[in-house]
Structure formats: C-alpha cells, structure tokens
C-alpha cells in the first residue's frame, strides 16, 4: 500500500487525507485493493458511527479511490474489494434517523454503488455486484433504493440475464412502491416469466398510481408477455388493456398488444368487440389497427366472420383513403376463408367498381342476401349485380394502355391474395411496414386499381359520377405517402487589476475582458491600463472626448437598448482575441450567474469561438455603459481594454473604435441575427436561458430547480425513448435501425437485439466532442428530425419521431455533457 494511504488510514490522519489528491492516479493504482480492505476494517469498528474523524477520513479516501479507479479504468481489478466493502454496509444501519440525513454506512454504500454500477456493461463486475445490489433494495434507505433502481434499470439493458435470477426480489420491491424497477421487467421476463406472472394482477393494479414513463414500461411488459402466448396471462391482461384503451396517451401501444393477442387467442377479444367499435369511433386514426383485430376474430368461425365483415364494410364506406388498403385486405381475407358468405363472385365485387363506396354497398347487399338464406352454404349460386356493374360482353381491341393496366391489376390482385393467405399474426398492413420496393412500384390509380372493367370502357356510368375511359390511369397516387440586463446587473464599477491583463468586477457575475498585449504596445498605454481608477472618477475634457459627448446625448437610449438586448444575447464573462491563419476570432466564456447547488457552470464555462468579434465587443461596450449612471469616457479603463480588443480585430479601411461606437451606436440587426444563429448552432440555448425573475442568464439546472433535483439522482435517465440510427455513413444510402435509447450516467445506451453486432457499444459522453442538428442545407424529406453526435473516431446520425422530440434529445444530451464537464471540474478542486 502506498505510504500516504498507510499513514492516512493507519493513523486516521484527517490533516493529510487531502494530500491523496496530489498523487498521480497511476502511482496509487496498485494500492487501491489494500486500501479498500483497510477502510472495511475501520468502518466495521464499533465506534465508527459516532467517530466524526474516522468518517471524514473514510469519505475522502473512498472519493480518491473511486476517482483513481475510473481514471485508470481498473474496475475489474478492484471489483472484489469494492463489492466486499459494499456488502459489509448491509450489516449496519442504513435507514436515516432524521430527514435528509444519511447514516455513515449509507454514505459509503452510495459512493461504492455509483462507482460499481456505472460499469453495468462489464460482465465480471456485474456478476459480483448484482446479488448485493438486490439486497439493498430491501435493506437500504428510500434514496439508496431509488438510486439502486436506476442503476439496475441500466444494467437490464445490456445484462438482463444477470438480473433474471433475482426477478422475485425485484417484483416484490416494485410492489412495495419502488416503481422505477418496472423498466427491468420486460428485459428479464423471457428468462424468468413465472415470478412476474404470479404477481401480474398486483402489478396491473398499480397502473393508476404510476408516472407516465412507468406506465409505458408496464405496457412494454405486457407486450413481451403477449408474445409468449400464455393463456393465463391473456385472461388477466385483456380486460385491463380494454379499460385503459380509452386513454389516448397509450391507445396505440395497447392496440399493438391486442393485435398480438388476437393472432393466437382471438376468442379472448370476442366479447370486447362492441367496446372496440366505440373506441374506434372516438379515435378514427386507430381504424387500421382495429381492422386487424376484427379480421383476426372473424377467422374463428363463419358467424363471427359475418359480424366482423359488417363492421369492416361499414368502415370501408366511411373512412379516408389511407385505411382502404388495410380494410380491403382484411375483408378479402375473410371472404376467401369463408367463401359461402359472398359465393363464387366475390372477386367480381372487388373488380367491378371504381368506388370504395360502391364496393361497400355491394358487399353489404350480398351480406344481407346471404343472411336471408338462413345460413345455408351456397357455393354454386350466381351473385346478381346491377346491369351497370356487369362486364360488357363486347370489348374493344386491347391497346398498350390496356395491357399495362392488366399487368398492374394482376399485380395488385396477386399481392392481395398473397397477403390474405398469410397468418394474421404475421401480416403487417401498416404503410410503415411496406418495403421500399413496394412503395416504388405498387401504385393505385384514382380507383385504386380496383376498377378493372369500368376503366377499360370508353364511358361507364356509376352511381357517384362518370369516368372517361380515354383518360387511362388518371393521376397516380403512390402507396407510400405522408430588468437589469445580462448577468445580474449591479452598480459596482469595473476595476483593472495590477497586471493590466484582465478586467473583472468585484461581483463574480460581471464579465471580465482579457487581452493579450502585443509586445510593441506603448509603455504609456500599459501604465495607464494598470492604474486602478474607478470609472466614475474620470473627468474628461468634454469638448475633446467625442465618445463621452455622444454617450451623454444618448445615455437613456443606450441603457434601454442594453436592457433589451441582454435578454436576447448573453454577455460573456470573459473574452480573448486570438489570431488564426485568416483573421482574428473572439473566444468567449459564459458561466451561470446563480451558481446553484446543481449548477452546470459553477466551476466550468461554456466556450464559444466567434468569427465575428466586433459585434460582441460592441455589445460588451453597451453593457459596460449600462452599469454606470454617468457616460463613459474614452480614457476609462474598461473602454481602453475594449478599444485594444477592437484594434486587434480592426481590418484595413475599417473605422476606429471611437468612430465605430459614435457613428453606429447599436449593432446592426443582421449582425445580431448572426450572433443568435451561431448561439443556436452551438446549442447554447440548450444549457442556458434568460431568467425574467433573476434578470440574468442562468444555466438549465438553475432555471429549473424542480427538474434538477430529479435529474441529479444517481443513474436517473435524463431522457429515454425510440430513435432511428443511421446504419450506413453515406448520405445517399438511407438505412435506419430503430432502437430504444436511454441517456443516463455517462453514457447513451441502447437495447441490443438478436441481430445487433455484439461489438456495438454505448456512446461514452466523455468521448463526445460535439452534438448538433443536421445542417439545414443538408436537410431533405428524409432528415427533418435528424441530429448528429461526433466522437473522436466516429459520427452517429439519429432521427427522432418529430422535430420537437429531436430538440428534446439534443437539449438533454448537451445538459448531460455539461454535467460531465462540471463534475470533472469539481473533482479536480475537491479536497485540494
């Protein structure tokens, strides 16, 4: 063990404990296991819970050890010692005596838990950790259980088999109120369904008490259970699903579960068909899914087929065109399965009308006729049709258009026949499931390729109008689509420091302006800059100072403008001007004015490199003036700094600082628009926002303290949901894979499927260099909701369900990146 560890732990020397952070991680890495064993001895002593010195030493040492393990990536080497210390905490009291006060051993358990379970994707570590983690669900404090649940949920994404043996304990923890663990159940169900099935009724009873994300995971569990075709599960969940179907939030998900059930247990839904009809009337957009359920139930026997056909036919006449394809497929599937319902001419009904309304009328008429025959099977009886729907006996010679039409109609009929003979549980009629080749080639005419003989004649009258044969195929419709400003203004003036290189306000929230002085700067300027003279104390010669006179004349306008502009454009805390190969750029640093407990930028800063430094300098100048009741002079210290920055960026033929500020007091609107656009492009507004209450720009956490408390729970996901990930890097190849992603801890995770590459790994936030929406110039119809994540060696492209969802993902990822950076900055300064 390292000498300093031996000294601190052996003598429990709190005064030297902070020195551990001055050691290099690699220098102490070999000592970590031994140090953990020594900590276990100290924490197990009888007086540990009352000995504040020992507790402080242990806390500092654990922080140093876990930091070194993370930085050296040696978790597997020290996992056994970590888990041993973690397990020993279970022998002691973990429940707090008072509110918001953890016991000493609960603090140890929390620190160790965070270190271990952040490595949920490492199998050797999780094999040791999961059995202990499950014990904490029943023994730990409420806060500890909640954090443990978050980490176990993440572990279930990649290592569900390790949790399967503990399914019973997980279910009991959920029933005791730990609903976060519901997200684990879909992952472990296939391995251990019995414990979940035994408590399924109790789990379903929790639905009304759950939050929206927890309800979603409960429904995911039912979907997984439905696929296993367990009759007992079906009997329990169908009434529950029907009851909750009236809630529009989840009716799409619930219908997908019911479709799964209808594929293998259609009779379970038979008694609920009237209720499903009512719901379909209330939510017409569910008609396509309802049609599949009615089609599946109709295949049970002829009596149910007739009943379901009446509903499907009525929808065919009433629904919009997007549902007609699905409805016709289900109708044809039922009439093919029970040929006696329509007789031998069922095919003619589909072929002899160019109107879905007419098809529906003919089908309804035949259903009534067959019902009047008292259910007798009439396999050979000819169906009578009105004269105007009969095929003409004489046909014109077949033209080239005629042949093309025949090919299209035959292709569509073959498609219907092929799909009709596919089992209901396999058929997918949603347009989302149609292959790209089908979208390209399978097209409907105005009559949806069902008006076979009517379109072939020159002029055939129908009930709803007249169609001219000479118009051919008409317009083809594809099967595929569809106060004080700024940073908290005070009245304390800026002062220059003794080195003359920085300008800072006594209030930490005020900006500082840094200028790297050129070597050839006149000594007199340097001396003037270094003098500590309060701004208001300067007495210029009014008639010689144009800037002073101009500001005096327009002071009220300047202050009003500064007040408004500070709400739209943040004022940087610090600014440097740097030369690059082409021009000068401004490097701007922004921090949060509040610096609350969960602040994203209390120790770190948001850095922006701008190719347009002069508008920023002008905005900073206006901000400076807004701080003082009197006009600023060109001799003012802060103005001299801004002037020096301006001159460093000044191009040939451009105005001097004084001329620019007097001739154009305010930045041009196009320049402001460019600044705001740049801030949007670098996702500044994801992590900062102007607080009307505080009158200042604050970080996301400080602006949303109620969210910050939830987000900062260990392992709590910032966001989760389905995204489409682009599988091929070339733009012209549009191949996407849908995955369920979770942003939590320091990673963006996804649930792996059987077909996924085993080498696919989560995205480590520490390796992310930038995140941005797909550039507008690259956006086309396929990428209106896409964003990119850039790491040191790869670019990921994702697509959300809509632009709003994409913005939510972008903001959450940027907040997570800021959190990680802030956490790193805090750890550097801890105990030093």
Swiss-Prot record:
Record's bilayer topology term: Peripheral membrane protein
Its main subcellular localisation, reduced to a broad class, is membrane
Give the residue ranges for region: Interaction with TGFBR1. Answer: 201-319, 663-832
Q: What's an example Gene Ontology biological process for this entry?
A: regulation of signal transduction
* Coiled coil, from the record: none
* Residue stretches of biased makeup (Polar residues): 499-510
Function of the protein? Interacts with TGF-beta receptor type-1 (TGFBR1) and inhibits dissociation of activated SMAD2 from TGFBR1, impeding its nuclear accumulation and resulting in impaired TGF-beta signaling. May also affect FOXO, Hippo and Wnt signaling.
Full protein name: Ventricular zone-expressed PH domain-containing protein homolog 1
Q: Give the species.
A: Rattus norvegicus
């Amino acid at each position: 063990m390292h000498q300093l560890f031996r000294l601190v732990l052996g003598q429990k020397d709190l005064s030297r404990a902070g020195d551990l952070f001055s050691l290099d991680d690699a220098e102490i890495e070999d000592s970590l296991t031994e140090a953990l064993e020594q900590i276990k001895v100290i924490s197990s002593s009888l007086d540990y819970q009352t000995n504040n010195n020992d507790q402080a030493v242990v806390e500092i040492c654990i922080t140093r050890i876990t930091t070194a393990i993370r930085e050296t990536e040696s978790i597997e080497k020290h996992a056994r010692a970590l888990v041993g210390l973690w397990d020993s905490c279970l022998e002691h009291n973990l429940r707090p005596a008072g509110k918001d006060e953890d016991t000493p051993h609960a603090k140890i358990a929390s620190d160790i838990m965070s270190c271990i379970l952040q490595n949920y994707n490492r199998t050797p570590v999780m094999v040791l950790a999961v059995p202990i983690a499950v014990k904490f669900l029943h023994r730990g404090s409420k806060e500890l259980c909640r954090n443990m649940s978050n980490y176990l949920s993440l572990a279930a994404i990649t290592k569900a088999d390790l949790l399967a043996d503990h399914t019973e304990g997980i279910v009991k923890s959920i029933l005791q109120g730990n609903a976060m663990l519901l997200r684990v159940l879909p992952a472990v169900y296939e391995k251990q369904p019995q414990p979940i099935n035994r408590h399924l009724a109790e789990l379903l009873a929790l639905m009304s008490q759950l939050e929206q994300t927890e309800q979603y995971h409960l429904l995911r569990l039912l979907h997984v259970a439905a696929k296993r075709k367990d009759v007992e599960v079906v009997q329990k969940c169908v009434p529950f699903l029907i009851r909750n179907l009236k809630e529009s939030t989840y009716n799409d998900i619930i219908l997908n579960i019911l479709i799964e059930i209808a594929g293998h247990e259609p009779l379970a839904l038979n008694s609920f068909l009237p209720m499903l009809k009512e719901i379909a009337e209330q939510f017409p957009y569910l008609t396509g899914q309802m049609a599949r359920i009615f089609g599946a139930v109709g295949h049970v026997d002829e009596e149910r087929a007739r009943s379901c056909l009446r509903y499907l036919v009525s929808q065919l006449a009433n629904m919009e065109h997007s549902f007609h394809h699905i409805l016709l497929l289900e109708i044809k599937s039922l009439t093919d399965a029970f040929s006696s319902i329509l007789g031998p001419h069922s095919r003619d009904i589909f072929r002899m009308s160019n109107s879905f309304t007419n098809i529906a009328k003919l089908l309804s008429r035949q259903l009534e006729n067959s019902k009047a025959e008292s259910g007798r099977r009439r396999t050979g009886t000819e169906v009578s049709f009105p004269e105007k729907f009969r095929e003409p006996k004489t046909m014109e010679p077949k033209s080239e258009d005629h042949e093309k039409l025949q090919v299209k109609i035959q292709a569509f009929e073959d498609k219907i026949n092929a799909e009709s003979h596919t089992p209901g549980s396999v058929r997918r009629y949603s347009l989302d499931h149609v292959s790209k080749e089908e979208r390209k080639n399978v097209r409907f005419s105005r009559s949806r390729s069902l008006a076979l003989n009517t379109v072939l004649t020159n002029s055939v009258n129908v009930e709803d109008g007249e169609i001219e044969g000479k118009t051919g195929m008409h317009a083809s419709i594809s099967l595929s689509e569809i106060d004080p400003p700024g940073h908290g203004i005070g009245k304390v003036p800026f002062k220059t420091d003794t080195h003359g290189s920085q300008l800072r306000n006594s209030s930490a929230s005020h900006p500082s302006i840094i200028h790297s002085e050129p070597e050839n700067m006149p000594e007199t300027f340097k001396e003037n800059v270094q003098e500590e003279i309060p701004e208001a104390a300067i007495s210029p010669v009014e008639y010689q100072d144009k800037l002073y006179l101009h500001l005096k004349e327009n002071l009220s306008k300047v202050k009003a403008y500064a007040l408004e502009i500070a709400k739209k454009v943040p004022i940087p805390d610090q600014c440097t001007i740097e030369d690059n190969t082409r021009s000068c750029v401004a490097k701007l640093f922004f921090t949060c004015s509040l610096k609350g407990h969960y602040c994203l930028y209390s120790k770190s800063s948001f850095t922006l490199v701008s190719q347009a430094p002069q508008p920023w300098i002008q905005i900073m100048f206006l901000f400076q003036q807004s701080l003082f009741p009197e006009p600023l002079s060109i001799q003012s210290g802060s103005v001299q700094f801004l002037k020096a920055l301006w001159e460093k960026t000044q191009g040939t033929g451009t105005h001097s600082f004084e001329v620019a500020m007097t001739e154009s007091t305010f930045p041009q609107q196009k320049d402001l628009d460019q600044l705001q656009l740049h801030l949007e492009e670098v996702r500044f507004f994801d992590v900062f926002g102007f607080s009307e209450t505080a009158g200042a720009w604050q970080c996301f956490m400080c602006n949303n303290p109620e969210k910050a408390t939830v987000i900062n729970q260990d392992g709590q996901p910032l966001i989760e949901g389905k995204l489409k990930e682009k599988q091929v890097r070339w733009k012209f190849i549009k191949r996407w894979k849908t995955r369920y992603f979770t942003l939590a801890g320091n990673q963006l995770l996804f649930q792996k499927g059987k077909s996924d590459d085993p080498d696919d790994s989560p995205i480590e936030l520490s390796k992310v260099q930038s995140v941005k929406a797909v550039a507008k110039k690259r956006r086309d119809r396929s990428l209106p909701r896409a964003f990119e994540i850039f790491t040191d060696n790869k670019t990921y492209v994702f697509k959300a369900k809509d632009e709003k969802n994409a913005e939510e993902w972008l903001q959450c990822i940027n907040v997570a990146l800021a959190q990680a950076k802030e956490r790193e900055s805090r750890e550097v300064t801890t105990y030093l």
